[in-house]
């Protein structure tokens, strides 16, 4: 992970950290690095979420691409996974998403996809970064007919939702589905898809104003969709983050069904159908112990990676697996798309409900979660990795592990995108975990600041 590119592209406060000048350079240098071995005129597909700064950054980045002779297809406001799909579908040479996912509205981000719709490997990001950090430009300025042009894809949402429908063998008639669009990228595509599948849709937080993305809504605020489900008597509630690459669901009682539960439910269904490749689900070190226990009962294994959907995806591609994801709701169905896809995950989960003819609360019983506590310690970016060298912090971690006595675990993880060290404890006693995690986070803040 470099200085510009984090675990999920370049991210920062728009117009301060992520400036139009930087976006322009990312367009120019990105075009050069990604297209230098290609002898034909390239094209790039660009999509964005609903942030106010999306237009600013898209305009600047587009100018960079055009100056390099790259044609731009502007997809408009669209989920991140839709851009991954449309990059392939439209035969673009690469794709770009302008979004900061679950971060507050003042943040934004830029990430690239290759022509297959996969995030770029670290070494390619490092090449782009090296040019920009060393203030090196490339000696290419297209002129006349060689300057790039922009076309707007007016049917981008339709192309994406039509594709999603091809992944199903049933409709959703008779279901009432509550949707929290998080004032983000799925605010049009989610209701369109679900209505076309025959469901009754109750929709909230579908009026983005550029500043209300993720604000008191969406997948990081599941209590909002939970309350709506109970109020309207829905069969299921689904809640998206800002760029709709993740999903949190709630059952008919308003109880949260997180990414681990979704993978268990869909994984067991795929196993029964003989479609779970190698009988493996790919999770992360943050995946609940309960997921492993549930999958073992059905003769399946959970392979764990570092946190981050890019690492889950790498493992899936290398191992030939079809289902993987994170507790946070990033779930990848690799038979259909190359990235976490909130809408795809939602319809696969709902299709499983229909196939099994069971309520979501019933399906969710396949997995029992151990209590997990996550506390963030605020630590300067440059100090995030130093905790391993601090003897007092390491002694405290060992003491907690001894206390949990093999029936729990401690996981310390520096954030890839924010100045935080995440402290996660898992075990049987929620109250004990709360105290231990809070004390450890405080110690980390004291020692590392």
UniProtKB/Swiss-Prot annotation:
Its EC number is 5.4.2.10. Its cofactor is Mg(2+). It comes from the Bacteria. This is Phosphoglucosamine mutase. InterPro entries: A-D-PHexomutase_a/b/a-I (IPR005844), A-D-PHexomutase_a/b/a-I/II/III (IPR016055), A-D-PHexomutase_a/b/a-II (IPR005845), A-D-PHexomutase_a/b/a-III (IPR005846), A-D-PHexomutase_C (IPR005843), A-D-PHexomutase_C_sf (IPR036900), A-D-PHexomutase_CS (IPR016066), Alpha-D-phosphohexomutase_SF (IPR005841). Pfam families: PGM_PMM_I (PF02878), PGM_PMM_II (PF02879), PGM_PMM_III (PF02880), PGM_PMM_IV (PF00408). It comes from Alkaliphilus oremlandii (strain OhILAs) (Clostridium oremlandii (strain OhILAs)). One of its GO terms (cellular component) is cytosol.
